[in-house]
Regions:
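Short secondary-structure boundary micro-motifs
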Residues: 2, 18-20, 99-100
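N-terminal active-site segment of His-dependent metallophosphoesterases
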Residues: 17-93
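Extended active-site neighborhood of metal-dependent phosphoesterases/phosphodiesterases
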Residues: 84-140
Length: 140
């Protein structure tokens, strides 16, 4: 590829760039919203990815009024392991730090919008099967 061809290609990139961000809005002013948060365990288990969960809940908090958010539902699998024992599991955080990090992410919603956090299979015991106990009620 010649330098001129490369320059032409790079010059055209801004034209194909993403459009400017537009704030979400309801089409009907009578409408309201339910926000559903999917499995969070992928964000909970690593120090580097926990801020992504905080960005998600901060976005919700910033849009409560604009989208008339009535409730937030988290479908479960909040953490990777309820009780992390030994090595061999993915992630670099203990289960306590996983639970605390996700609870901290939801703090921004406290007193602003009701939210429900369900348990998933990752939120019980230290394997995906076994005793049916969870630390969810200690953090939420």
């Amino acid at each position: 590829m010649t330098l001129a061809a490369l320059a032409a290609m790079l010059w055209s990139l801004p034209a194909a760039a993403q459009e400017e961000y537009r704030q979400p809005a309801l089409e009907n002013p009578e409408s309201w919203s339910v926000v559903v948060i999917p499995d969070l365990q992928g964000y909970a288990k690593n120090e580097a990815s926990q801020p992504i969960a905080r960005l998600m809940t901060a976005w919700i908090a910033d849009n409560i009024e604009r989208l008339n958010v009535r409730v937030v539902l988290c479908v479960g699998d909040v953490v990777e392991q309820n009780d992390r024992i030994g090595n061999g599991f993915s992630g670099d955080l203990t289960s306590v730090r996983q639970w605390q990090g996700m609870a901290d992410a939801f703090d921004v919603l406290d007193g602003r919008v009701p939210y429900l956090v369900a348990t998933g299979n990752h939120d019980y015991t230290y394997t995906r099967s076994g005793a049916r106990r969870t630390h969810l009620n200690e953090y939420f």
